[in-house]
Structure formats: structure tokens, C-alpha cells
Amino acid sequence: MSEVRDGGAANLPTRQPKMTTHTIRKVVYSAFGGPSNVSVVTAQIAPPAKYEVQCDVIYSGFSGADIQMRIGTYPLQKSAPLTPGYCFVGRVSANGPKSSKFYPGQLVGALSMYDAEAQKINIAEKYLISIPEHVDMRQALGVILDWNTAYGLVHRATDLVKKGQRVFIHSISGAVGYATMTLCLLEGAEVYGTASERNHASLRELGVTPFTYTDKNWKAEMKQRGGAHVVYDPIGFEHYNDSWDILIRNEPSRLVGFGGNMNILQGEDAKPRSQFPSQVKLLAKNGCLVTKRSTSFYYIDRDRSTYMEDLHAVMSMLDQGKFEVPIKKTWDLENIREPHETWGKIPGVGSCFVRVDPNAAL
């Protein structure tokens, strides 16, 4: 199979469009709080800076990070007002004066963190990756954030995911949970996890043992099976204690935290809390010298030295047909308040997207 790599601009036309300011539609969180603070506005976007590339956004990703940023609990986030959009796929429309790696019209994607829920985005050239034209855009977009995060959880956060090991994943029918499940199964692990009961039948067909989160029966069941070698927990806060409790104790085991979704699960009326204190407590468990259990916290970081290496690896897996990204729901940009109002109630499994270009598939 062909290897997915950036570039390809050297032998292609280099004429640049005239650098002008454009009028665009974009999403804005006017203040932290409920969905009423989400709107789509008309704004101006400046030409790309020296080392930036301006892209016409086709699809933007939508995930729990959007909800966390709206309520103001995403770690180290910007202050409101802000434009969300953690990742995107689109086409290059203009290069900055010192950018030449990609050519106008080339299909690209990036982990943007902000500003992708807009018709155009300016982004540093170093964060872009080229996407082969034969790869489905939404599949590629799912890889950039959800599946790349899962790849890091499986291959960077621990070395214990392997054949015969028991892996427990909370929120296994979510975008990152489903991706983590798939990559663990590819490694030969036995996979267990919590999910909405409506998704249990489809998960069993994949060879997974699902549990209902709310009744806590999964704790006794996993202990009866000997405990988990790895637990992935995106819920955080006090929930880390329950996850720690189901780790196997007479063999090396690891609890990996990767989120603070308790803020979302508690509903709009609950007071949001900072994730930082619970993360400190999670990592403090490593100070216990009389156990083989350990902890870590993983987050995706586009400036990490292994980020591009991992992204290329998982994009190549997609290109080789080793997995497919299930799509749960796609919304139009102009209806962006809807996912904020219905988050957590959407049936199905997989990744969610925002269609920015109305001519793209919905």
C-alpha cells in the first residue's frame, strides 16, 4: 500500500491567489455557559501570516472538547469569546509568504484546536497533513483527532496492550472509546467496557464484553475475571478511584486517564470543576511502592515530538483498510447549536462532524 506523506507541491503550480481579506461565517462562543451562548456570525478573516496556510474548511470535527470549551472547563483553554473547531479537513486556498509545502487546491487536514468551525481558517503550515484524494474526507477527519488520540492511548500511554491482556474502556461507544477498542482488538487484547445499553448488541458482535455504566456491576465482574491490565478512563474526577479498583494487582497494570467528562455527564445545571486537582491525585497513586498498579494521563498534543509520526501511522492504517471510522452524526454549520443541545443523547457509535461546505456530503 502507498505510504501517506505530506508535500507534493514541488512540481505543481505555485501561483498564489491575491492575498485579500475574506468575509466568512464562523461559530462563536460569546461566553462560557449553556448552548444559548453558541451562535454563527459573519466576520472577516485576514490573509495568512508568513508561515501560515489559509484553508477552505469542508468538515470540522465535533467532540466532547467542544462541550468542555463551551462550559469553560477544557484544560488551559482560551477565554471566551472564541471560535471552536478542534480539527478539520479542507483545501488550501492561499499560502503565506514563507509557506510553500502545500499547493492551492490540495486536500489537507490538521489538529487546529480552535477556529475550524468556520468557512476559512489560517493555520501554521507545520500542523497540516496532506490527505490522499482517494481517502474519504470524513474518515480522514476522524483519524486526525479521535483515532490519533486512541493510537497514543494504546501505543504511547502504556505498553501493556497485547494479546491476552484484559483492557477495560469507559465510554466505549464514544468516538475515542470506539477507536481505542478497535486498536486494542487489532493487538489481540480482550476488550471490556461501559456503554449505553442500546449499543451492547453491536459491541458484542465485535467481540467486546459491554457493561452498563450506571449499575456498577462492571466492578464486581472485572474483579471476578481477575482484574484489568489496562483501564482507560475519560470520565475523571472521583471516577478514577473506581477504575483504579478494577486493575489486576499481582501483575503490572495501568490506569490511563484521558479526559474530564464528568463535567458533561453531570448536566448543564451542575457547577463545572477544574480537572487539574483530580489529575494530580491520579498521578499521585504512582507513589505507592507496594503495588504493581500504575497511572498516567494522556492527551493529544500537536507539538509533541511523536505527534506527526503517530498521525502518519494511523492514517496509513486507514489507507490500508485496517479499520473504518464509524460516523455517528454530521450537522450543518448553521445548525451548530443542535449538537450542544442534544450531546449525550445521540444514538449510534463513532465520530461526529460539522459540515462547513454545504456542497459536501451530509
What do the predicted segments below correspond to?
Residues 1-16:
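N-terminal amphipathic/basic-hydrophobic helices that include classical n-h-c signal peptides
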